[in-house]
Each structure stands twice: as C-alpha cells, then as structure tokens.
Design a protein with these regions (language model features):
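Small-residue-centered hinge/linker elements
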Residues: 1-116, 128-132, 136-211
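Glycine-rich beta-to-alpha transition loops that act as phosphate-gripper elements at the mouths
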Residues: 119-127
C-alpha cells in the first residue's frame, strides 16, 4: 500500500483557479510503486459552508476553518486517485447546522458512490457538529484524552421577571426589582445541553460524569 497526503492550502488567500494548481498529493509512506492508494485528509477548525469575503479582512483570517464547498472539490480530486480507503484526521468544535449536514452528506455520498471505506481519527476535539459529521464514516478512532461527543442544539435564553415592582436605570445599567424573583428558561435540544447553568442544580449523573 501507499499512503498519500492531500495538501490543502489557505483557502482565503487564493481563487478557485489558483487553488487547483496548489493542491496536490504527496507521498507519505509505503511502497511508492503500489497502485493500492490510501488517502489521508487533515481537517481543522469550525465547519462552515464556504469562505466569506468578510472573513479575509477580519482579525480571525488566520484561523483554520473547514469549508464544506472546498472539501467537496477535494473529494473530486481524491476520486481520480481511486483510493482503496480514506483516513480523515479531524479536530473540530462543530459548526453551523447546514454546513455540518452538508459535510456529513458529502462523506456519506462519496463512500457509497465510490464503494470506498472511510475511517476517521481525532487527536484532540470532536464535538457537536464535528461528531455529527464523523458519524458518516465507517469507523471513528480517537487518541487518548480526546474530547468526544456533545451533540445538541441551543437557542437563546429567556429571562422572565416574575411580578416586577420597580424598574430603574442608572450609570450601571438597568435594574429590575421583582416580587417573586427571576426565572431563566433555556431553549435546548438534548440532555444536559445547559450544563453549568447557574439557575439550576446539577443532576447526580452530570456530577458523576464531570468527576
């Protein structure tokens, strides 16, 4: 077997035409005369659908990002190599719902249409949408100490002032005095997605998991 690595350039810095000339496969290890190729892809950062021009001029333009639109182009290049298998090395905290959904489908579609085994490995972080996308692979491997899981959706919090009796403003901001206290409602989908919420007691299972 021969292990090939796909070099992925800084996507914000190049147009799609320039990017095609820069991306290439490099020999990693194995028998370089073999036709049995295994491709290694490295993905790092949050998951977004495509690059935004606004990001290029922001303070975060050097942060690594997984762009699904560019990943799909990479898969087209990989298909030409006719690999026996693909290893995706990923570290991601998650991303937008639509981008994560598209990444999952891109991997799943490639795997089925090309009858290619896809294995996924993480060294440090595979959380939220990152783990969701990883479920499209045939098997997930994790290094010791890697943070895995935590899939869920959280919306904005709803603060309710129960029976307010005084509202005032000042140099320190607005203050509200209530007769029956303040209640906070969390919009979440999934168990314990409001972990460390100061407005509720932790469950016994949550404490045991953290310990």
């Amino acid at each position: 077997f021969i292990l090939l690595g796909l070099l992925i350039s800084n996507l914000e810095s190049f147009s799609s035409t320039e990017r095609t000339n820069i991306n290439k496969f490099i020999f990693k290890e194995g028998d370089n005369t073999s036709q049995n190729n295994i491709v290694l892809i490295e993905l790092r950062g949050p998951i977004l659908n495509k690059p935004s021009g606004a990001i290029e001029f922001s303070l975060i333009d050097n942060i690594e990002v997984i762009y699904v639109s560019e990943f799909v182009k990479d898969l087209e290049e990989i298909k030409l190599q006719n690999p026996k298998g693909i290893v995706i090395s990923i570290d991601s905290p998650g991303g937008s719902v639509s981008a994560t959904y598209n990444l999952y489908n891109a991997i799943e579609k490639f795997k089925i249409n090309n009858k290619t085994k896809i294995f996924l490995h993480t060294d440090e972080l595979l959380a939220s949408g990152g783990y969701w996308a990883a479920l499209s692979s045939d098997k997930i491997y994790a290094s010791y100490g890697a943070m895995i899981g935590s899939i869920g959706v959280r919306g904005p919090d709803w603060i309710y002032y129960d029976n307010p009796i005084s509202i005032s403003t000042g140099i320190l901001g607005q203050t509200i005095e209530t007769k029956d206290g303040i209640k906070k409602y969390n919009t979440i989908a999934g168990r314990s997605k409001d972990l460390f919420n100061s407005f509720r007691m932790p469950t016994k299972k949550e404490v045991e998991s953290l310990q």
